Structures are given as structure tokens and as C-alpha cells.
Amino acid sequence: MSEVSQTVASERRSLWDSVKPYFEKESLAAFFVGVSSGFPFAMIGATLTTRLAQDGISKKTVTAFTLAFLVYNLKFLWAWVIDGVRLPVIGRLGQRVSWMLVAGLFVMAAVINLAMVDPKADIAWTATSAILVGMAGATFDIVIDAYRIETLKPYQLGVGSGMSQYGWRIGSTAAGAIALVLAARYDWSIAYMACALLALPAMLTALILGEPPRHRDPIERKGFKAGFNAIAGPFVEFFKRSGAWLVLLFILVHKIGDTLGQLVLRLLLNDMGYTNDEIAIWDVGVGFWAFLIGIFVGGVLYSKLGLKRSVLIALVLMGVSNASYAVLANFGHSNIGLGLTQGFENFSSGIGGVVVVAYFSALCDLRFTATQYALISAAASVVGRLITGTTAGAMVEDFGYVNFYIFTTVIAIPGIILFWWMSRIGLIDAAMGTAGGGKDGNPETPH
């Protein structure tokens, strides 16, 4: 074989080696469960914000609805049930598979219920229905995250997290776009009922692939003490690690600014006079593709730079991206401006979605996957959601959108500094769980 032929063959192998991990069954499973994970969030997030704003509900009331997201932040309280309680009859399908089916049906029922409410006639029942969707979506997320982490091998966490984020964004974007288009042509009830079908990809994936290979069957426990240990065990194990409290502090503060900015975004766009079609094209459409590109770049950064450096880069980009909303608010209605702003923000979020989720997944102990990841993911946005639901609306009304988004940029700085410091003193590696190759796990995961 000539030198040129060898070079071409080598380049082809290199290209295939780069693409191949995305087509492994574990990565594809992460993608499809991610689709179903994303859509309930959209149903009580930007989509519901738009629906309420168009119904003339006040800003303070609309932002108060984001408290429904706090249910996601409390999911660690019942995540132990998903880890340790075996369902009767259907449980023969496997612990994760059976819970995936039950949680999926719960989500579909809750979304259909929210479809039937009239916010103008009964705002209290609308709020209750949104909370029910939050509870169902949070339970679905517990199962989905555990299924993803236990399906992926340690070396697949980067690619798998990327595929999960691809799926999450497609699910949330599809739900948002479908809801906007159908609501503009029919009504919000039809829009929400159509979106309920997005629970099916995760349910079908679990049925087809079956139980994750790394899942450890629940241990039969009897008595009060044994039951208490089943609940407390995952938390005790996590906090016994070196630097666990600092890791938790980072999880709590790293995303405050990003959470605040995103949950108020649709209010900004509504006040700037953007139509549903403009939002669908320039916000949802451009943002969608920018996010996908960001996910790809995030996967490259993770594989080339390792976990610590790639996470630090992502944190800086996500913090700076919020400042672009202050620029948009200052210059006023502009479709190109909205496209550029959403492009930058979603590109940054795509990178962060891969590397930060990979880091959080690696923190889990495989004995307590559902409970520990529920704790980590819930803590990641609880502060931002609490501030949004209690004071964000008043902050916008008192200080204006420009100053509000400058504030969200500034409060991203502590999380960046904390992660940099933990990397310098070795706490990132010391706190790693078995899912990421720590302790008795596979040490090949890039840190």
C-alpha cells in the first residue's frame, strides 16, 4: 500500500473512531431518554410563561409560577423510592424499566390535565396543575438520569452526556415549537395534549433495551432502621467524601445567574413585542442549532482537555453569555439581535450541558445512582429558581431588564472561582464517585 493510501486509510479510521461513540447503543439510549426528559420542563417553563403572559397575567404572578420548578429541586426526597422500591407485577420487567413506564404515564396524565385548565378563570388550579406536571417530570427525570448513568460506561460519560443534552434540547424545543404553532392556529389545550406524546421515546427505549447493565438490584430491607438506612445511605456516602461540602456549594451557586436569566427571558421577549412566530424562528430555531453546535464543541473539549479544564471554560462562557441579554434589552426589538443573543447563549449552554452534566454524573456512586444524581441535579438550580419565583419579577419591575441581566452576569463569578480553586487543590478528583471511575470504578475517565 502506498504512503498516500495509508494516510487516507488512517484519516478514515480516525474520522470513524471520532464518530463511532455517538452510534453506540448506550449513547443512542441516552439521546432518546433525553428527548422525554426535556419536554415536561418546557411545559411549565417558557411555554407556560408565554401562555400566561398572553392571557394578561401580571409579571409577579407569572414569575411566581416558576416555583413549580422547585418540585424538581425536592426530588431527592423521594428518589430513594426509585432506587429501592420494587413495583408489584410490572416490576418483573426490571427496576428501571418498570419505573420508566409508570413515571412516563404519570407525566402524560399531568400534561393533559394542564392542557384542560383556563388560567384566566382559575389561576389557583392552573398553579396546582403546573406543580403536578413538575412532580411528574421530576419523577420521570429521576428514572431517566439513573437509566442513563447506569447504561453508560465511565469512558462514555462525555459522549453520553452530549447525546442526552441533544435529546433534552430536541425534546424541550419540539415541545415549545409545537405548542407555539398549535396554540397560534388552534388553542393551548390542543397544543399541550399533542406535546404529551413526547414521553414515549424514553418508555420505548427502556422496553427495547431493557435493564441497564450497571444497575444493582435493590436489596430487600425490613424494619425501621433498615428503611432509614435505605433513605440516608446515599447522602451519608456522598458527604463522607473529601471536600463533599465544597462540591455541594459549587453545585448550588454555579448556575444561579443562568437560571435567573432563562426563566425571565420570555417576559423580556413579550415586553419587547416579539410575536410567537418571531420567537419560534429567532429564539427557538436559532437557539436550537446553536445549542447542538455547542454540544459538539463540548464533547470535543471534554475529550481533548479533560473534565476540569473543559468545565472551567464552560462556566466562563455561560456567565458571559447572560450579558448579551442586557445588550438586547438596551437596543430594543431586533430579530437579528435576538438571533445573535440566543445563538451565543445556547452555544455556551450546549458546551456546559455536556461537560457539567458529565461531571455531575461522575460524582454518583453506582449503589445510589437515582438518589445521588437527584440530589446533585436538584441542588444545581434551586437557588436561582427560588430567587426567580420570589423576587425576580419585582427586580425586573424595579431595576429594568438591562440592570437585571448585568446582575445575573456578576453573580456567576463566585462559582467560577470556586471550581478553579477546587481543581487546584485536588478536590475534584478526591470527590469522584464510582460512576466516574473513582474508588473501585474504572480509572480511565478523563479528569
Over which residues does each language-model region extend?
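Juxtamembrane intracellular "pre-TM" segments in multi-pass secondary transporters
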Residues: 6-23, 214-246
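Helix-loop boundary and gating motifs at the non-cytosolic
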Residues: 12-72, 245-250, 254-268, 272, ...
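Glycine-rich segments within core transmembrane alpha-helices of 12-TM secondary carriers
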Residues: 72-75, 158-177, 183, 377-388
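Helix-to-loop junctions at the C-terminal end of transmembrane segments
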Residues: 75-92, 293-310, 396-397
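C-terminal ends and interior cores of transmembrane alpha-helices
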Residues: 99-120, 316-333
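Symmetry-related core transmembrane helices of the 12-TM Major Facilitator Superfamily/SLC fold
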Residues: 102-108, 190-208, 403-421
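Intracellular juxtamembrane helix-capping segments at the cytosolic ends
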Residues: 138-152, 351-365, 375
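C-terminal transmembrane helical hairpin of 12-TM major facilitator-type secondary transporters
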Residues: 309-356
